[in-house]
UniProtKB/Swiss-Prot annotation:
Activation/inhibition comment: Allosterically activated by GTP.
Lineage, broadest ranks: Bacteria, Bacillati, Bacillota, Bacilli, Bacillales
Disulfide bonds: none
Function: Catalyzes the conversion of uracil and 5-phospho-alpha-D-ribose 1-diphosphate (PRPP) to UMP and diphosphate.
Gene3D superfamilies assigned to the protein according to its UniProt record, in alphabetical order: 3.40.50.2020
Protein name: Uracil phosphoribosyltransferase
Amino acid sequence: MSKVYVFDHPLIQHKLTYIRDKSTGTKEFRELVDEVAALMAFEITRDLPLQEVTVETPVGPATSKKIAGKKLGLVPILRAGLGMVDGILRMIPAAKVGHVGLYRDPETLQPVEYYVKLPTDVEERELIVIDPMLATGGSAVEAINCLKKRGATSIKLMCLIAAPEGVEVVKEAHPDVDIYLAALDEKLNEKGYIVPGLGDAGDRLFGTK
């Protein structure tokens, strides 16, 4: 069964307060999301395997460590997931970036894939699916489906804020995918928004309505 991790680092929680604040403007909101994504990347990579190597310093040889195992890949869900990519790349600059685009069918209300572009070696990478909000869980489940259909076997989900309903949907659909959050909020309202949440992450990132 998948595990859920909520990061309580003081810097993450401090910045998340300003992200939630409706008076925070687009520029500051964008910068804060970027910063929190970078901090979350630090936390989500704590379990990466290491191997010992020997390097030459200006003084002499040194035994040190470097990351081993699968290479990393980032997969933002369009469009709001894009706001978290640069912050993560600052921490993991060698990661390749794919994209998954989804829209909601007006009749069935189910997410439909309209764009998928992934690294050619997804089966050899540990992929981090990125979306600021995990509300109903439908988009996250479908994005993970897209990756698995193309051969991905090692996947994590990173979101700023989640509703319990969305977390349970993802856990049921993908029990092999761990979920990493900055906050787990109270519930969804009748419109499917996370309460208290932060509003529409995409609109606040890109200055749209």
